[in-house]
């Protein structure tokens, strides 16, 4: 850069960090169509996780099946490897975000979160769900209730023209009522990406964020609650359109 500036002494220079990212922030109709296909692949991956999650199954064996399903995709179209590697958060490994899987078997009494995704021609869609082996504790059920209610509040607040910080506040009000705390952000713009990250580094759903949600933005809302010795996650990838938002995945 210094050599370029020295060679053009009469030019004026302005910072353009993330310029292309902000252009990518608003998706075309063709991109939305591609992300809908990625959403269908994410559904396939999560169904594979759901069907294969059994006590005694090794995490690595389950992840092998999940990864294969991501690449096989659907009968109509195949998938790519998502920009964020798929995650199994089991037991104490679920106390923090983004752990790698291992060769430990899934155990009775564990809470296991799956943070997966679908990718179609490098367009990524995230999807997270949580299962529990056995009878869930009152704390887990209460946290689950808060997270599900919080997701509904976020979806009600997320629409073209909304302020990102206001969307986060809708979540925070629910969390406050339950007496729970989450210090990290709850969502970000997602789209075309390569490893190691599928986020676009533009919009973030966090306090005081003043970015306006535009028409045809796509946001991965990830509600991860990581406790002292367990954790859970629920996520949806949402398309901001019209007067609200719609899910790009259809999974219970």
Q: Where are the regions that the model predicts?
A:
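Active-site neighborhoods and metal-handling regions in enzymes and metal-associated proteins
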Residues: 1-252
């Amino acid at each position: 850069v210094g050599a370029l500036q020295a060679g053009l002494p009469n030019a004026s220079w302005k910072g353009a960090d993330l310029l292309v990212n902000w252009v990518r922030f608003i998706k075309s109709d063709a991109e939305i169509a591609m992300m809908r296909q990625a959403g269908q692949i994410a559904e396939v991956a999560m169904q594979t996780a759901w069907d294969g999650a059994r006590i005694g199954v090794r995490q690595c064996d389950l992840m092998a099946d999940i990864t294969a399903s991501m690449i096989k995709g659907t009968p109509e179209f195949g998938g790519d490897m998502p920009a964020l590697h798929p995650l199994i958060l089991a037991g104490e490994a679920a106390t923090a975000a983004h752990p790698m899987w291992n060769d430990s078997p899934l155990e009775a009494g564990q809470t296991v979160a799956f943070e997966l995704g679908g990718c179609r021609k490098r367009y990524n869609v995230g999807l997270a769900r949580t299962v529990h082996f056995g009878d869930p504790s009152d704390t887990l059920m209460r946290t689950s209730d808060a997270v599900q209610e919080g997701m509904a509040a976020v979806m009600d607040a997320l629409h073209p023209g909304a302020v990102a910080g206001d969307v986060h506040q809708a979540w925070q009000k629910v969390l406050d009522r339950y007496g729970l705390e989450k210090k990290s952000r709850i969502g970000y713009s997602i789209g075309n990406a390569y490893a190691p990250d599928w986020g676009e580094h533009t919009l973030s759903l966090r306090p005081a964020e003043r970015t306006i949600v535009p028409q045809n933005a796509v946001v991965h809302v990830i509600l991860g609650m990581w406790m002292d010795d367990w954790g859970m996650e629920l996520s949806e990838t949402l398309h901001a359109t019209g007067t609200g938002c719609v899910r790009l995945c259809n999974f219970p």
